Amino acid sequence: MNFINLQAQYLAYKDEINAKIESVLSSSSFIGGTKLNEFEQNLAHFLGVKHAIGCSSGTSALYLALRALDIGKDDEVIVPSFTFIATAEVVALVGAKPVFVDINLSNYNLDFKAVQKAITPKTKAVIAVSMFGQMSDLRALEEILKDKNITLIEDGAQSFGASFKGEKSCSIAKISCTSFFPSKPLGAYGDGGAIFCHDDEISKKIRILLNHGQTQRYKHEFIGINGRLDTLQAAILNVKLKYLEKELDKRQKLAQIYNANLKNCQIPQIDPNAFSAYAQYSVLVEDRASVLQKFEKANIPYAIHYPTPLHKQPCFSEFSNLELKNSEYASEHILSLPFSPFLSEEEQEQVICIFKD
């Protein structure tokens, strides 16, 4: 059994993917070009946004978002502590201060009341992570921020394809970012990501920054990075994008089976207004150590997303005295189960059996 069965996915689309790879290899056009342009247009159409910009990873997408907003020294950016490190890492990389706040245990996303309490005159942005594939009510969060000159950024690394009240993840915030890491709902065969916005000037600046700050060849207006999405990944992702909604439907069905059959754990709590992309299927278990022993004895893969909240990480030691009870509880009790659109009925039953004792 695989935690995420990427091989089965490849075999399902093998002929199309191989043809696209061969097309790129034959063209000898590996950076930029029509394949990348086509993918970006398809992304924008899928979300209903004006601008979709392919980039080298979800991390570079977040970094470029902050750079495009001129966030830096003496600025503060509010982030959740229960998330992958990239969300806060990029804040530190641009010279700003990450301000860690707690989450709701219902959806593992930002606690909006905690966000309100954390706002200071130095707050320039809030990065809202759509954890495990479920969005928060970003319109409600926008309402909190709108009169304070604070920009909302969605970290939709895990939620591409999700929606809230019919509005898709990565289509609402001033700038939204996603990841195409292989395990994500829309995954590449390597690293990749994208940035989404409706603002022409922000889009223009991001495109300059991700290409070493060049406004024309060898003329560098800004200190930028190599943040480009390569053409080969764009071609592969373009194939997978066609099947995303079909895969999302399968994720819903598999999640419903887990929901109906898992015992002795807290299953994901999905808001009635939300459609989750179920990037992971994660549960809370009271005695995680004993459950993990059962998984290991049965040779069933699992993951812990995430074992240490960011304010307890060594690289953020200056925040170690913070008490963020929900983030700490989640890190101690969270467990991600084998899950992908290609999880078989037999494999899922093996996982369910672990929780029956």
Where are these predicted regions, by residue range?
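N-terminal "arm"/small-domain region of PLP-dependent enzymes with the aminotransferase-like
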Residues: M1-S29, T34, A298, P338
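PLP-dependent aminotransferase class I/II
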Residues: Q7, L36-N42, F46-A52, K113, ...
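Conserved coil-to-alpha-helix start sites within the AMP-binding
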Residues: T83-A88
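Helix C-cap/helix->beta junction micro-motif
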Residues: V94, D147-K148, A298
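Short beta-strand->loop structural element characteristic of the AMP-binding/adenylate-forming
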Residues: K97-N107, A303
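Active-site phosphate-binding strand-loop segment of PLP-dependent enzymes
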Residues: S106-A188, F196, S336
